[in-house]
C-alpha cells in the first residue's frame, strides 16, 4: 500500500448516485445488496488513485472496481457516500469482503509504511508504521494476500520482468508498480554507493602493536 490523497467528489455524484441511492434504499429496505449506482464513477475514482489499486498498489489494466471501505452490509448508510469509496482490483475487493476497520484504509497509509523485498517480491510492513496500527498492518498483509500471496506475487513479477527486459524504464515501472520501483531504486543506490567507495575503505585497518 502507498499513500493516497482523498479523491474529491466528482460533479454529478450527488444527483446521480447519492440521492437516487438513498431513494432506492427507502423503497427496498430488505434488499441484500445496494443498487450499484456508483459504477459510472469508477473512472473518476481510478483517476484519483492514479489507476493503482488502493491495496496492492499495482496498475489495474482491467479498469478495477469500487470498494466500499466500510462495507455496505455493515454500514448501509454509507453505501452511496463518496468518502467511503476506494479504487481496488477485483481480487483485493473480494479478499477484503467485510473486514472493514480491520484492514488499513488507503487514505490513512503513510509514506514508506510498506516495502517490497527483492528478489522475492514479498511485501513487508516497515518500522514507519505507527505502533498503534502495526497489528492492522500485519492483518492487512495476511487478509489480502499482500505479503506473499501467489496471485499478487505473479502480478508483481510480470511488472518487474518488463523492467528487467528493458520494456519498462524505471519511471515506467514507478507508474505501474511504485513499490517495486522503490525497491529497485534502493538497490541501485546501494550499488552506486559501493561502486563509488574508495578502494581499501571498506574497513579501517589498525596496524598491529609491535
Predicted region positions:
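Histidine-centered nuclease catalytic patch
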Residues: 55-87, 98-114
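Conserved, surface-exposed functional patches that form binding/active-site neighborhoods
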Residues: 96-164
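C-terminal, charged low-complexity interaction regions
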Residues: 133-210
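Short, charged surface segments at domain edges that flank catalytic/cofactor-binding sites
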Residues: 2-52, 75-80
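Amphipathic alpha-helical interaction segments
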Residues: 21, 32, 57, 122, ...
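Short cysteine-rich loop/turn motifs with clustered Cys
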Residues: 38-65, 89-92
Amino acid at each position: 500500500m502507498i499513500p493516497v490523497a482523498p479523491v474529491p467528489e466528482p460533479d454529478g455524484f450527488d444527483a446521480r448516485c447519492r440521492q437516487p441511492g438513498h431513494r432506492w434504499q427507502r423503497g427496498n429496505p430488505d434488499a441484500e445488496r445496494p443498487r450499484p449506482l456508483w459504477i459510472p464513477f469508477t473512472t473518476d475514482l481510478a483517476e484519483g488513485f492514479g489507476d493503482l489499486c488502493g491495496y496492492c498498489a499495482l496498475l489495474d489494466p482491467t479498469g478495477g472496481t469500487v470498494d466500499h471501505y466500510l462495507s455496505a452490509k455493515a454500514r448501509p448508510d454509507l453505501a452511496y457516500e463518496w468518502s467511503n469509496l476506494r479504487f481496488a482490483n477485483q481480487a483485493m475487493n473480494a479478499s477484503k469482503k467485510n473486514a472493514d476497520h480491520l484492514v488499513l484504509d488507503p487514505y490513512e497509509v503513510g509514506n514508506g509504511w510498506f516495502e517490497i523485498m527483492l528478489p522475492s517480491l514479498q511485501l513487508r510492513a516497515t518500522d514507519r508504521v505507527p505502533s498503534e496500527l502495526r497489528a492492522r498492518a500485519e492483518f492487512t498483509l495476511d487478509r489480502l494476500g499482500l505479503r506473499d500471496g501467489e496471485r499478487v506475487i505473479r502480478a508483481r513479477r510480470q511488472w518487474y520482468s518488463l523492467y528487467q527486459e528493458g520494456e519498462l524504464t524505471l519511471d515506467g515501472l514507478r507508474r505501474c508498480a511504485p513499490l517495486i520501483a522503490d525497491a529497485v531504486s534502493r538497490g541501485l543506490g546501494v550499488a552506486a554507493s559501493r561502486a563509488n567507495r574508495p578502494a581499501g575503505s571498506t574497513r579501517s585497518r589498525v596496524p598491529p602493536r609491535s
